[in-house]
Amino acid sequence: MHSLQAKILDPRLGSDYPLPAYATAGSAGLDLRAMLQEELTLEPGQTALIPTGLAIHIADPGLAALVLPRSGLGHKHGIVLGNLVGLIDSDYQGELMISCWNRGQSTFRIAVGERIAQLVLVPVMQAHFQLVESFDESQRGAGGFGHSGSH
């Protein structure tokens, strides 16, 4: 298991509400909580920036973190991330904030301490451009947007 530096920015995290943890041995994501001062109401179409009460420093340029929606919130209530996926660079040290978007048809209430997103650590490979005049031919070429078939 990889070690990750973390700072608790909201004292309720770790006392009133559990620290992020893997739910099972096979879980890929750590749940992030809405560390709000009071319950928040999201009307259909509305977005809000939600604090997690947690800052991390990955420190390893070979790693990054992704903030992803929780499947149940999206499927059952239409609550997804406003930016669809959050990317946390290895050198970022600020608070993790969650952009929540109510794409559903009903008002949704986010309770203080509710699990609203998940954090997944992923490997990163940085690349540099090798500028060329043309590419070696591939079977696909420049075809896109359904070019490879529908089934």
UniProtKB/Swiss-Prot annotation:
One Pfam family it belongs to: dUTPase
Broad EC category: hydrolase
Reaction(s) the record says it catalyses: dUTP + H2O = dUMP + diphosphate + H(+)
Cofactor(s) the protein needs: Mg(2+)
Tagged with keyword Transmembrane: no
N-terminal signal peptide: none
GO biological process assignments: dUMP biosynthetic process; dUTP catabolic process
Keyword annotations from UniProtKB, A to Z: Hydrolase, Magnesium, Metal-binding, Nucleotide metabolism
Protein name per UniProt: Deoxyuridine 5'-triphosphate nucleotidohydrolase
Organism of this sequence: Azotobacter vinelandii (strain DJ / ATCC BAA-1303)
